[in-house]
Amino acid sequence: MSSFSRAPQQWATFARMWYLLDGKMQPPGKLAVIASNKLQGLNKPVYHQLSDCGDHVVIINTRHIAFSGNKWEQKVYSSHTGYPGGFRQVTAAQLHRKDPVAIVKLAIYGMLPKNLHRRTMMQRLHLFPDEDIPEDILKNLVEELPQPRRVPKRLDEYTQEEIEAFPRVWTPPDDFRM
């Protein structure tokens, strides 16, 4: 193979790709795993811990993330101002109302390695609460990553034919009153 034909392959290996990830109805931890792998460049053959070869990740719909169970009220985020009596705690619901991208940002920040590259990797993360993406970012996008979990269908999204075709466990008699 000549060096002329290897040049595009090498360029594609070292180039910074832009990935789109939809956060609608997805748990923040699952989004963080996918995003941290792309931000670190773990998917590239030239990956090394000391090299900065990660890609850009754009996450949309962070306002519509989903927690399982009662985590909106039970999960607590803590911080300290550094002053006496400056310990602060907020639940996930309070933090999400205040800043819709903060929960996903903190989840990804916690997944990245604790070294000097961490803040550089976070600069390549672009979070948006809705589907509105600036035009300059939109033109750079290369690939849309699959969602980690299948999004369930809401009850009002089913057609009447699908409802009638659904198998019934029990059919009430005509004179049955509720």
Curated annotation (Swiss-Prot):
Glycosyltransferase in keyword set: no
A Pfam short name: Ribosomal_L13
GO molecular function terms noted in the UniProt entry: structural constituent of ribosome
Gene Ontology cellular-component annotations: mitochondrial inner membrane; mitochondrial large ribosomal subunit; mitochondrial ribosome; mitochondrion
UniProt xrefs under SUPFAM superfamilies: Ribosomal protein L13 (SSF52161)
Principal subcellular localization: mitochondrion
Top-rank taxon, per record: Eukaryota
Biological process, per Gene Ontology: mitochondrial translation; translation
CDD domains, alphabetized: Ribosomal_L13 (cd00392)
Positions where N-acetylserine occurs in the chain: S2
Compartments reported by the entry: Mitochondrion
Keyword terms of this UniProt record: Acetylation, Mitochondrion, Ribonucleoprotein, Ribosomal protein
Similarity remark: Belongs to the universal ribosomal protein uL13 family.
Oligomeric and partner information: Component of the mitochondrial ribosome large subunit (39S) which comprises a 16S rRNA and about 50 distinct proteins. Interacts with OXA1L.
UniProt-listed HAMAP family: Ribosomal_uL13
The protein, known as: Large ribosomal subunit protein uL13m
Record organism: Mus musculus (Mouse)
Gene: Mrpl13
